[in-house]
């Protein structure tokens, strides 16, 4: 064996043997996620994003994020009729450390939807596209099932095709009238109270008795041009404040100097 110095050991071993471990969360910031004032719970959670560095602005990575929240959590209500409805909220603007969200859709939970489908009854579904007063184009899915007559001895409660067509037409008319005659805020309140489905069930009783009538899903297909002042009205006190306002953690509106921009951190 040759006797001599080990050059590798004298120089500290191989290159890149040990690197300093950096916690990735040290480069991130927490932001509060705010729901519109049509819901009782304003702060629905927090979200994480990389801190602003150079041309990578944190707010650009926050806009467009979609949050799915149960209606029971939004309304602080343990009623089981609210727990199976999920509302989708999309981040549209960032003010200070607050992510301001707007309505982006609604859906039922999978277990609720599957539990309604049973044998010996007719499923009736209607899909309607309608536009609100303030320019939101929505696709609304409505579902209902025929109900068994208590005085009947039959096991089944199937509806005739002519009755199904009449019920579907009645569903379409009611949804069109409700959506086209309201703005987005009024429509969200109707969806939270489930008033549209109750009107459909009541109106179709003369054609064929129904049960488990629900607005199953709502999709936002098109939105009007983004306006900061309208978004701040949804998150403020409704006083029509201009875009020089910021929503605080309690939902109040705070004025800031005109032309104010948050400072950009150059180093982490």
Curated annotation (Swiss-Prot):
Function, as annotated: Essential for oogenesis; required for late follicle cell development.
A single GO cellular-component term on record: cytosolic small ribosomal subunit
Residues covered by region (Disordered): 1-21, 238-268
Record family assignment: Belongs to the eukaryotic ribosomal protein eS1 family.
Entry keyword annotation includes Cytoplasm: yes
UniProt GO BP: oogenesis; translation
Subunit structure: Component of the small ribosomal subunit. Mature ribosomes consist of a small (40S) and a large (60S) subunit. The 40S subunit contains about 33 different proteins and 1 molecule of RNA (18S). The 60S subunit contains about 49 different proteins and 3 molecules of RNA (28S, 5.8S and 5S).
Gene (name only): RpS3A
Location of the protein in the cell: Cytoplasm
Protein name (record): Small ribosomal subunit protein eS1
Coiled coil location: none
One term of GO molecular function: structural constituent of ribosome
PROSITE patterns, A to Z: RIBOSOMAL_S3AE (PS01191)
UniProtKB keywords: Cytoplasm, Developmental protein, Differentiation, Oogenesis, Ribonucleoprotein, Ribosomal protein
Pfam families membership: Ribosomal_S3Ae
InterPro entries the record matches: Ribosomal_eS1, Ribosomal_eS1_CS, Ribosomal_eS1_euk
